[in-house]
Amino acid sequence: MSGEDEQQEQTIAEDLVVTKYKMGGDIANRVLRSLVEASSSGVSVLSLCEKGDAMIMEETGKIFKKEKEMKKGIAFPTSISVNNCVCHFSPLKSDQDYILKEGDLVKIDLGVHVDGFIANVAHTFVIGVAQGTQVTGRKADVIKAAHLCAEAALRLVKPGNQNTQVTEAWNKVAHSFNCTPIEGMLSHQLKQHVIDGEKTIIQNPTDQQKKDHEKAEFEVHEVYAVDVLVSSGEGKAKDAGQRTTIYKRDPSKQYGLKMKTSRAFFSEVERRFDAMPFTLRAFEDEKKARMGVVECAKHELLQPFNVLYEKEGEFVAQFKFTVLLMPNGPMRITSGPFEPDLYKSEMEVQDAELKALLQSSASRKTQKKKKKKASKTVENATSGETLEENGAGD
């Protein structure tokens, strides 16, 4: 990113920026729905990850065609983490694949950007739920808990509120279902070309993290990727030795790479992905990419997104949405096709204050402002109602 870009930060105070976010959100929602529909027993996770990434590239290739210099595409590679796998499972062709089976709890996580404006989304569902039946037991508990955490956050991430209010609500919601938010996971503010902005919301912090984590107030015209990860177990995510395949460049780090393979790999990263997360799958020669990444990661030019696991036998559910803090209320631009009636838990939120919050409306005040001409592709993401009402649930 050039110095000029840094001086003139573009925000959602500009209509065109809002349109770019919505277009990215619309693509993210459509790709997600397509992957959910394609997920069934016997389907390979690798094939779904490849399909998701290919669709994002294809769909972003259809917009702003005249703007030859504009970067657009994947803001987070398609990851599909099953059951006790917490996040970032996105295998290479040379890795062991995972084949989906009946009853698997599946989390799909992906991101799209248009001109560096990022729309992230994640969704959880269970494979092969027969019509007329419901998911029960711990899978239902953890999915309900995570979904209600996301719904609480949609109502709490608004100007004037603090990030700590969201953290507290998440703990209360999860505990009502005898579940635990994954310890130390962060939701980030988003800025142009930046997926990990400085303001964050932490989940289930340790005592040390509570001391270290910056308190922050949400402000109008900010954007957040709100990421909820809840476990049926203790909420501790560990690296189990699975190969990391997703990385992002850290623009603040510099180092003179010694190996020719590393240098060639890193210059391709800079050219193609800038500071967006990418997968080693995106390289033509996967073997060279696997070699090139080692020196880059060792010297912290690249940050890894490690594949994390909860204990065997536990379940982890994830819901992530991107929200624009508009002057007339929060606008959620991404969301999955959640069907609440499929999940039956014996537990529910007991806390009266939280119950009232969850029952309150999350739709925005309508403005009598003349609509700017937005692209056809974003019409169904522009109403600003919660997306369940305008197509995210169909």
Curated annotation (Swiss-Prot):
One annotated Gene Ontology cellular component of this protein: ribonucleoprotein complex
Annotated region (Disordered), positions in chain: 358-394
Modification N-acetylserine occurs at: S2
Residues modified as Phosphothreonine: T366, T386
Key words of the record: Acetylation, Cytoplasm, Isopeptide bond, Nucleus, Phosphoprotein, Repressor, Ribonucleoprotein, RNA-binding, rRNA processing, Transcription, Transcription regulation, Translation regulation, Ubl conjugation
Covalent link Glycyl lysine isopeptide (Lys-Gly) (interchain with G-Cter in SUMO2), residues: K298
Region (Interaction with RNA): 361-375
PTM summary: Phosphorylated on serine and threonine residues. Phosphorylation is enhanced by HRG treatment. Basal phosphorylation is PKC-dependent and HRG-induced phosphorylation is predominantly PKC-independent. Phosphorylation at Ser-361 by PKC/PRKCD regulates its nucleolar localization.
Necessary for nucleolar localization: region residues: 2-48, 301-394
Database matches in Pfam families: Peptidase_M24
Induction: By mitogens.
Tissue distribution: Widely expressed.
Region of interest: RNA-binding: 46-54
Molecular function, one GO term: transcription corepressor activity
GO biological process: negative regulation of apoptotic process; negative regulation of DNA-templated transcription; positive regulation of cell differentiation; regulation of translation; rRNA processing
Biased composition (Basic residues): 365-375
Residues with Phosphoserine modification: S2, S335, S361
Subunit record text: Isoform 2 interacts with the cytoplasmic domain of non-phosphorylated ERBB3; the interaction requires PKC activity. Interacts with AR. Treatment with HRG leads to dissociation from ERBB3 and increases association with AR. Interacts with nucleolin/NCL. Component of a ribonucleoprotein complex containing at least PA2G4, NCL, TOP1, PABPC2, RPLP0, acetylated histone H1 (HIST1H1A or H1F1), histone H1 2/4, RPL4, RPL8, RPL15, RPL18, RPL18A, RPL21, RPL11, RPL12, RPL28, RPL27, RPLP2 and RPL24. Interacts with HDAC2. Interacts with RB1; the interaction is enhanced upon PA2G4 dephosphorylation.
Annotated family: Belongs to the peptidase M24 family.
Cited function: May play a role in a ERBB3-regulated signal transduction pathway. Seems be involved in growth regulation. Acts a corepressor of the androgen receptor (AR) and is regulated by the ERBB3 ligand neuregulin-1/heregulin (HRG). Inhibits transcription of some E2F1-regulated promoters, probably by recruiting histone acetylase (HAT) activity. Binds RNA. Associates with 28S, 18S and 5.8S mature rRNAs, several rRNA precursors and probably U3 small nucleolar RNA. May be involved in regulation of intermediate and late steps of rRNA processing. May be involved in ribosome assembly.
Protein name: Proliferation-associated protein 2G4
Organism from which the protein derives: Mus musculus (Mouse)
Gene field: Pa2g4
